[in-house]
Swiss-Prot record:
Disulfide bonds join 8-24, 12-27, 18-34. This is Metallocarboxypeptidase inhibitor. The presence of a 'disulfide through disulfide knot' structurally defines this protein as a knottin. The modification Pyrrolidone carboxylic acid is found at residue 1. The lineage of its organism: Eukaryota, Viridiplantae, Streptophyta, Embryophyta, Tracheophyta.
Length: 39
């Protein structure tokens, strides 16, 4: 079971804005929020 990441769902402008997260490190530009990393 994954714990919610504190950076998940935070606003972002670039991928690096989410780089401190474990489970939510991708920046979805359409929504401008961090989301689960997709390899």
């Amino acid at each position: 079971q994954q714990h919610a990441d504190p950076i998940c769902n935070k606003p972002c402008k670039t991928h690096d804005d989410c780089s401190g997260a474990w489970f939510c490190q991708a920046c979805w530009n359409s929504a401008r929020t961090c989301g689960p990393y997709v390899g």
